[in-house]
Structure formats: structure tokens, C-alpha cells
Amino acid sequence: WALENEPEMEKVWFADKEKLLAILRLYMGVGAKRRRKDFMYAKQIFELISFFFDGESGERDEFRLADDEVKAILNDYLAAYDHNDDNSMWFNKLKEIADKNGYASDMKAYKANPENFKGNVSDIAEAVRIAVTGRANTPDLWTIVHIMGEEQMTERIKKHIK
């Protein structure tokens, strides 16, 4: 499909076959409890994964937080980020960023008293997710960052801090 319909992008998409396979496993749910069955044709898949490839441009979701909030969160994220952290350690750092910036790291506390917080840790994750992928909804962000690589992730976040 790619060679016939997107010949200029085929070389980009298939340049690193292991990366492409990791992306497809993530998006198709290979090895997961439930596999995706909603893709009707290849173009849908490549539209969803286009953000992995530099030079790809597409529609970006808007940040729901104010610009100064986003910049503070992204600066804290880059300062705390360690590519060697496992998913649990990484998420705990997101919780620390939430606490530092006035967001709830504990969803029970947030649900009990939402007025005490600017938002919750999911707002922190969403800001990072949009900066990295351009989308508010994606599969597991930690996995995306590890497939993408630290350098590409950092470059994308720094674009939003300027």
C-alpha cells in the first residue's frame, strides 16, 4: 500500500523497520488483551502514527492549559526525565510535577476536593502528550516516548517551551 499510494513517505516509514514494528504493535494491540479491529485500511494507521516521523505535519490538538502552565509543566518534565526510568518511575515523576504545580497527584483527593487543585495528574500527562505527539489521546505515552527516542521527544518539548 505505502509504495503505491505514498511513495515519498514509504522510505521514511520503512527506514527503521524495528521502529515501525514497535509502533504497529502498540497501535494494533499486538500482545494485548484486546486487539484493535477498527482499522478499515492502511491509510488510517499511517495517519495515526505520522507523529513518530520527523517532517510529518498534521493537525495538532490544542493545549487546554494556559501557555505559562504548559511551559512550567514541560520544563519540570524535561528536568525530571530519565530515559532509563520504567513506566512506574516515569509516572511517579509526573505525579511529582503535578504536586509541584498545584495539580492533584492522587485522584481520590482530587475527586473529594477538586476546588483545591488546578486539575489532576492526567492534565500534566495531557500537556506532555500534546507536546510530544500533537494529540490529546494516544496509546501509552511512556511507550511512545521510548519508541520515539529521547532526542526526538526533547526537541518537540523544547519547541513548546520557547
Please tell me what each predicted stretch does.
Residues 1-162:
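Conserved nucleotide- and phosphate/pyrophosphate-binding catalytic cores
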